[in-house]
Amino acid sequence: MSEDIFDAIIVGAGLAGSVAALVLAREGAQVLVIERGNSAGAKNVTGGRLYAHSLERIIPGFADQAPIERMITHEKLAFMTDNGAMTIDYCNGEDASASQVSYSVLRSKFDAWLMEQAEEAGAQLITGIRVDNVVQRDGKVVGVEADGDILEAKVVILADGVNSLLAEKLGMTKRVEASHVAVGVKELIELPKLVIEDRFQLQGNEGAACLFAGAPTDGLMGGGFLYTNETTLSLGLVCGLHHLKDAKKSVPQMLEDFKQHPAVAPLIAGGKLVEYAAHVVPEAGMNMQPELVGDGVLIAGDAAGMCMNLGFTIRGMDLAISAGEAAAKTVLSAMKRDDFSKQSLGEYRQHLDEGPMRDMRMYQKLPAFLDNPRMFTAYPEMAVNIARDLFTVDGSAPVPMRKKILRHAKKVGFINLMKDGLKGVTVL
């Protein structure tokens, strides 16, 4: 092949794309990354939690040099009604290994740093350019068309986000279904470092991750989130796109009401809004995955549906990193064989099965389980009402605790409780 042909062209400088570029460049591959934003991370929106295990494997001790915000040591899961909340609070005071922890991050900073690591290893980055088409020759992907220029490569890695038009043009995926994605909105609220630590009972670089179900999305599938950064809070909500047709409020109004909730307002009081962003995020996991491998092409990251909403936590960044690493390993093996056919690149699935797909397969039925209106209406209301009755003393004749609980459980329906409980046991 000509010297003008790259070993790999990667579309998208998010986590999957940057990691793929880093791993490839370390082995001497000629890599070009094309990012439509003005910088790596400019187009990325996330709540902001990175589970460290996948990147720790690639860059040991990365937290010592990367622009992380806080190490998550406090977990809060709240069930909310319009005026109340019942919260499960967990604090981890034990020492954990570098691969067991998680961090709050700001993607604009973190992605830029990660791409810098790839560039230092030898990868090339072009920003502010949109890839319009994938170039094919005799049914095989041989490059991309960007800004009117044809750039050739032995293999193309598509890491261009949840709504990958390039994968759609190749026929590797269908147009994204509304039931497979959610609309996410996020505000970045600035507060003094010591104020954040005082309000969330943190010390040093400790951080908190908070998830909220019920009222934030007005009873629709989704939820609210809050992550503590060093001097800011990442606050927002995510709502299933196909449920918005039934919404009585707009998503911006949901966010405003969420901010005014008595369980949230004191946490953000006095804060200054410094950033607002909205984005479409994958929600269906394996149920929305495209064909991941083609002749001369691989798909990774959000474009490959690498996201898991487990209810009690949300994962996406660590899966994207693992997918980027898997894509790079696959390309390196293909380079040794000088074979970039679909069959040769099929090794990608094996690498994924040993990493992110293993986790995603275990929870692949969970999205359907969570797509149950009782999860965001009846159950939060039941939890809050039970807590209210347990903690209220008004001088009236005492009622046995079991009767208080049964009274509210009856409103949900014992058959519904049994049915949902059994289904939950089978999917978790």
Swiss-Prot record:
Keywords: Electron transport, FAD, Flavoprotein, Oxidoreductase, Transport. The keyword Electron transport applies. Gene3D superfamilies: FAD/NAD(P)-binding domain (3.50.50.60). One of its GO terms (molecular function) is FAD binding. Transmembrane segments: none annotated. It holds the Pfam family FAD_binding_3. The keyword Ion transport does not apply. Could be part of an electron transfer system required for anaerobic carnitine reduction. PANTHER family: ELECTRON TRANSFER FLAVOPROTEIN-QUINONE OXIDOREDUCTASE YDIS-RELATED, PROTEIN FIXC. Belongs to the ETF-QO/FixC family. This is Protein FixC.
